[in-house]
């Protein structure tokens, strides 16, 4: 797509915008009436288990985009996507704050969301029905990928008074591992076990969203909290301006152990000065953030949304240095939606 002449792209966009104007009431399968009241039983897309991509589905007045907590990166970046999509197409977009990856996959699977932000590892688990209780033996066969975006960095935030210098030092500590059932919790438990030798009985597990985890650290209610998001994470920035906080600098051995246990982890580094009071670079690991959708969501709409985002990257300010056409399939862990594939081919 990137090599297509500008005039051809403009003509194509005109056609897509026309399709949007003509088809805005039929853009989503299993979408209900757009008010969230009974979104799981609208249309005739069913559960999508035996269908291909791009069904015409039911009716909706808005693209329902599920993001994450307001203190993370998913929510503000989704707000920027909303602005670009509404500016470049005739589709209205509604961005919702959610518990992020695991919840978002469930919303896509039952038709309550049309697009969602998720982690690439959670996408793999959900599509293949493994490793997570929410999906074990019950794969979300309608889950489809749109694009990967940027590294989702694992932040292990520490109370400076806790005297923690390694993951194994968290034995017996109060540790917030993220929202119950979230991708953050999954990553935290994986890392604590593989790199720290700790299972859930070895520490006092707490479960809240990013913002509440920051509050717990500020109030001294936990010794450590896991936050997963592209740096700088808003909740961490805010915490660092009001509270002394440290971020665990993972050793080479800890990072290697995490990578050996889970292939979706990659080495990552939080640059010095990213957060107030953190004067040195912090070594850690990361996963990938991605946009996902449903197999029964209209291919023309997915293509139009994908094109709107990737042809207007200059309008993004959050994570724009990582998001691009050339890297949009790096770490893609599930099958692409037909509409996204048409754009990137």
Predicted segment positions?
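Charge-rich, low-complexity N-terminal segments
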Residues: 215-228
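Terminal disorder- and signal-encoded targeting elements
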Residues: 1-134, 140, 150-153, 160-169, ...
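Short Gly/Pro-enriched turn/cap motifs at secondary-structure boundaries
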Residues: 146-147, 280-282
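Short, well-ordered beta-strand elements within core beta-sheets of diverse protein domains
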Residues: 158, 289-296
């Amino acid at each position: 797509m990137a090599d297509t002449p500008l005039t051809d792209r403009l003509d194509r966009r005109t056609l897509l915008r026309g399709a949007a104007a003509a088809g805005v009431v039929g853009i989503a399968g299993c979408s209900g009436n757009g008010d969230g009241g009974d979104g799981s039983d609208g249309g005739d897309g069913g559960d999508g288990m035996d269908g291909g991509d791009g069904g015409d589905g039911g009716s909706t007045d808005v693209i329902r985009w599920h993001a994450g907590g307001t203190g993370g990166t998913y929510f503000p970046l989704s707000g920027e996507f909303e602005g670009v999509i509404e500016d470049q197409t005739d589709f209205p977009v509604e961005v919702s704050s959610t518990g992020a990856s695991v919840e978002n996959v469930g919303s896509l699977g039952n038709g309550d969301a049309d697009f969602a932000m998720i982690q690439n590892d959670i996408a793999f688990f959900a599509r293949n029905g493994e490793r997570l209780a929410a999906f074990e033996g019950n794969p979300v066969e309608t889950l489809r990928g749109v694009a990967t975006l940027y590294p989702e960095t694992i932040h292990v935030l520490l109370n400076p008074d806790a005297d923690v210098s390694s993951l194994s030092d968290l034995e017996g500590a109060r540790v917030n591992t993220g929202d119950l059932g979230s991708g953050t919790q999954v990553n935290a438990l994986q890392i604590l076990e593989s790199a720290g030798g700790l299972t859930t009985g070895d520490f006092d597990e707490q479960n809240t969203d990013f913002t509440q985890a920051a509050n717990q650290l500020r109030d001294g209610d936990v010794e450590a909290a896991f936050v997963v998001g592209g740096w700088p994470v808003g909740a961490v920035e805010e915490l660092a301006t009001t509270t002394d906080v440290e971020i665990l600098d993972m050793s080479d051995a800890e990072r290697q152990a995490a990578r050996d246990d889970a292939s979706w982890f990659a080495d990552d580094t939080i640059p010095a000065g990213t957060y107030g009071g953190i004067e040195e670079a912090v070594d850690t690991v990361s996963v990938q953030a991605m946009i996902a959708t449903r197999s029964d969501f209209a291919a023309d709409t997915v293509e139009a949304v994908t094109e709107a985002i990737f042809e207007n990257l200059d309008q993004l300010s959050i994570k724009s240095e990582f998001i691009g056409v050339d890297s949009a399939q790096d770490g893609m862990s599930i099958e692409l939606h037909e509409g996204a594939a048409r754009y990137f081919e």
